[in-house]
């Protein structure tokens, strides 16, 4: 149990470090042209309400990922549900579970940067600066590859099956749609 907790701490620190590095370029981001035409006063008085809605929405998708990993991906990769596995199988199940959450967390928390930086539809109507885009997608790429490396194995992660990425795409698209709805309600 203690070894697993120590590895989980390393996983969380690594996730936070890579995410923080991907955010370094935010001060050099583009601003939509309509914000440059005339000075605007920023009213942050209801920012708390926005955070109260956006924060828990992220947790909803974490829980969906947990359920996906526990009830679908884990049993399909390891051939059985968690409680029917031997000790070695349970350890592999935990490594797979952590890898799935690790990757999903990076994708959602990084892509939401692109969602909330503009009133427009990101990537279509408004694009982040090259440095922001480069660092955020590099962070996502690096973190997605870690479970497939020997380093990933050492910190308690294992490779994810291809079907995971189909589910991840659905989760990310739904999260981005919900973040867009919340953003539009806030901007009103």
Residue ranges of predicted features:
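Membrane-embedded transport module
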Residues: 1-121
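C-terminal transmembrane module of polytopic membrane proteins
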Residues: 16, 70-78, 98-188
